[in-house]
Amino acid sequence: MAESRWHTFEWDDENRKNGNVQHLRDHDIEPEEAEECFFHDYALARDDRRFDDVYIIDGRTDRGRKLRLVFQGKSNGVARVFTGWELKPQKKRRS
């Protein structure tokens, strides 16, 4: 299991229309699945198009789903996930 810098997660009320929980659910991701990605091996990059504390993580859930998440890394190990989507295997091109 990977050691994560982020171990606490900031979630909006699940009934908030424009909150991060509802936004993830619109992409068929449950908050628990997003959290699981931080506790398995993952690839991490800064999102230079945004602010310094915004990152992209490619991780996997306990059930093996591969997800890409965009989140803000806050102080004291807190992560606020903004959005995410499932990484689908790419089809090989025929030449």
What are these regions (language model features)?
Residues 1-95:
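Ribonuclease/tRNase effector modules and their secretory precursors
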